[in-house]
């Protein structure tokens, strides 16, 4: 395994990782709902022993996972990743390019199942072991997916999954306030941002980011500066309401009881974005779930320095087998 270190990170990403991944990339779109194109990328390993479906987090895109895909390919996995609706190059259900809106959180789940069934399995003819890797919002989507479609994947990795949210006020108060706002203008205000946003902030702010690795944060921030498709920053009122409901559903006794596959839950010890209590409850309710905490790290565990990142990936690959 060729690990990318911090000393020459940007240079190594541009000279080694990007060309390697690009040479193995196939891009495409699909429409589960007519007129709503979902963008995806397939990355084909030189010698694959299985395949990973990658489900990214809130305001992210497939482009944020180039380094992660590089390691997955080297480990012998084909990788299939979508830009979830409202993100990246996929269909946007609202006009503000900086705001992520969701009519129904379940649409993410239905998209992911359709993508796995129709693109990964049928079109790309993946017949070997199929695994799920879901980060944050993508982890909540993943949890819902393996509850609803328990035989779709062989194993699942949920990394800092969004199973309970952190708000500056108690969740019931936030939900009540957002619901009142959302009812304005005949419900049209659900597409408006929870906090006003009309531009992408062009000044990096590593200290308040979700990352523990500065070079990785700056590398992707530079990508976002140059690509308007990567500049989503804020949730809509509707997204916030749907996310709260999705978290509650995903950790419920009724739904967690449906999970039949092994799950590895990687938990960030210093997560300021999601409430780890939701992850703890989920893990306690899923007999086949192994919870592994990475002490002191912020939300995005795949964006840590190599002294943490290498053991993180080694644990994941050992789990997948």
Language-model region placement:
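An N-terminal hydrophobic leader/cap segment in hydrolases
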Residues: 1-31, 38-43
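Active-site glycine-rich loops that stabilize anionic/oxyanionic intermediates
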Residues: 49, 57-60
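Conserved alpha/beta-hydrolase
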Residues: 62, 69-95
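Alpha/beta-hydrolase active-site loop
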Residues: 100-121
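Alpha/beta-hydrolase-fold enzymes
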Residues: 142-231
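Short beta-strand/loop motif that positions the catalytic acidic residue
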Residues: 259, 265-267, 271
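Short alpha-helix in the alpha/beta-hydrolase fold that links the catalytic acid
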Residues: 261, 275-284
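Catalytic histidine-centered segment of alpha/beta-hydrolase-like enzymes
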Residues: 297-311
